[in-house]
């Protein structure tokens, strides 16, 4: 434990430039990247304010209205979700309901296009 206490004392005495150099050396030695943690540590309280400005990476595909071609929408919901006929029909009739949750932007856009082509109204959240 005495060795760990000495390491902590030595690290506490480093300047900001020395700490940055240490970080780079450790990244090279261990083959990792500390980009996000360093940015959060450097930004401090500003990180919380910047969080809403970050681009979302996960989206929910929400069916808001089945439209006039409900059968086509049910077919697309089944294809997207893998649900059975009854479950897909119940989901479509209970709109607004999420069809897929936590999907990538590319997948969300693809699912939205498929559902809209079938006659549904869809939102991405």
UniProtKB/Swiss-Prot annotation:
GO biological process terms on file: translation
Classification via SUPFAM superfamilies: ClpS-like, Ribosomal protein L7/12, oligomerisation (N-terminal) domain
**InterPro entries, per the entry:** Ribosomal_bL12, Ribosomal_bL12_C, Ribosomal_bL12_C/ClpS-like, Ribosomal_bL12_oligo, Ribosomal_bL12_oligo_N_sf
**Cystine connections:** none
Is RNA-binding there in the keyword field?
no
Which GO terms of the molecular function aspect are on file? mRNA binding; structural constituent of ribosome
Cellular-component GO terms for this entry:
cytosolic large ribosomal subunit
Cite the entry's keywords alphabetically. Ribonucleoprotein, Ribosomal protein
Q: Which NCBIfam families match?
A: L12
Q: What does this protein do?
A: Forms part of the ribosomal stalk which helps the ribosome interact with GTP-bound translation factors. Is thus essential for accurate translation.
How does the annotation summarize its subunit structure? Homodimer. Part of the ribosomal stalk of the 50S ribosomal subunit. Forms a multimeric L10(L12)X complex, where L10 forms an elongated spine to which 2 to 4 L12 dimers bind in a sequential fashion. Binds GTP-bound translation factors.
Q: Which family does it belong to?
A: Belongs to the bacterial ribosomal protein bL12 family.
- Full protein name: Large ribosomal subunit protein bL12
Q: What species was this sequence derived from?
A: Mesorhizobium japonicum (strain LMG 29417 / CECT 9101 / MAFF 303099)
């Amino acid at each position: 434990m005495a060795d760990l206490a000495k390491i902590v004392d030595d690290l506490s005495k480093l300047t900001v430039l020395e700490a940055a150099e240490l970080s780079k050396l450790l990244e090279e030695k261990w083959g990792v990247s500390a980009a996000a943690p360093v940015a959060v540590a450097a930004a401090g309280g500003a990180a919380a304010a910047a969080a809403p400005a970050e681009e979302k990476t996960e989206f929910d595909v929400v069916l808001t209205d089945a439209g006039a071609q409900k059968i086509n929408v049910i077919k697309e919901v089944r294809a997207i979700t893998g649900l059975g006929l009854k479950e897909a029909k119940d989901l479509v009739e209970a709109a607004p309901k999420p069809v897929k949750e936590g999907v990538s932007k590319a997948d969300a856009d693809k699912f939205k296009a498929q559902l809209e082509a079938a006659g549904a109204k869809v939102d991405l959240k």
